[in-house]
Amino acid sequence: MSLELLSKLETKIQTALETIELLKMELEEEKQKSIGLAEQNQQLSQDLNSWNEKVTGLVGLLNEEVN
């Protein structure tokens, strides 16, 4: 191989490595977002359950008052 071809190959390899590093960083960011969204989802589910219990209790009280 000529030096020119080796230089082009080296450039392409360097570009590929940089792209891989950027993709790894993006993947890590997305993983962190996913973890945050999972935590938020869990909190919202707990809030929903709490509200459902409160509403069920209030409906029960209303039913007792009606009867």
From Swiss-Prot:
Keywords: Cell cycle, Cell division, Coiled coil, Cytoplasm, Septation. GO terms for cellular component: cytoplasm. Gene3D superfamilies: 1.20.5.340. The keyword Cytoplasm applies. Residues 3-59 form a coiled coil. It holds the Pfam family ZapB. It is found in: Cytoplasm. The keyword Coiled coil applies. Belongs to the ZapB family. Homodimer. The ends of the coiled-coil dimer bind to each other, forming polymers. Interacts with FtsZ. Non-essential, abundant cell division factor that is required for proper Z-ring formation. It is recruited early to the divisome by direct interaction with FtsZ, stimulating Z-ring assembly and thereby promoting cell division earlier in the cell cycle. Its recruitment to the Z-ring requires functional FtsA or ZipA. This is Cell division protein ZapB. It comes from Shewanella woodyi (strain ATCC 51908 / MS32). The gene is zapB.
